[in-house]
Amino acid sequence: MKNNIILEGFMGSGKTTVGIRLSYKLFMTVVDTDKLIEKEQGMTVSEIFEKEGEEAFRKLETACLQKLLDEGNKQIISLGGGTPIREENRELLKKLGIVVYLRVKPQTVYDRIKNDTSRPLLQCENPLQRICDMMFARKEAYESTADIIIDTDELSFDEIINLIRDAVEQYEKDRGISL
């Protein structure tokens, strides 16, 4: 297993912001898989979805994870919200490092991203219902991949970061490993 901390969770769960702040606290590099894909493809995630479709984007996520597995170490990796839905991605994530699931309630997600037009999967008539449906469909994938689960709804970013740091330290201690 690589010495990375991987942040997974639904869109709007705080993965990107937590990843950046956690990287400062732990003196680790932060990598956002969506940003890597956008840079490599020369398009935003929304544009990839629109032009190529979701399945093409999911394949790009798999290729990105494989590249990180081949090259990356001692990083905070912030995933796209749908990355764990593919079985092959879940297998790669387990090899990449410690997976932390930032769990959040549907209403919290909706409140955070209701005005964000860059979320292609939420451009629909009833975004809150879509969030509920998608979270239900992804729940098992998130939970089966996670080594650590943090419920983030009522927490500040500093509280989340401290919980992650403490949980990762305990995880390492319990397994005799070290990042």
Please name every model-derived segment:
Residues 96-139:
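A glycine- and Lys/Arg-enriched "phosphate-lid" helix/loop adjacent to the NTP-binding pocket
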Residues 2, 21, 25, 98, ...:
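NTP-dependent small-molecule kinase module
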Residues 13:
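ATP-binding Walker
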Residues 7:
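Hydrophobic anchor at the beta1->P-loop junction of P-loop NTPases
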Residues 81-83, 105-107, 155:
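Short glycine-rich anion-binding loops that position phosphate/pyrophosphate groups of nucleotides
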Residues 16:
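Walker A/P-loop
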Residues 10:
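P-loop (Walker A) phosphate-binding loop of NTP-binding proteins
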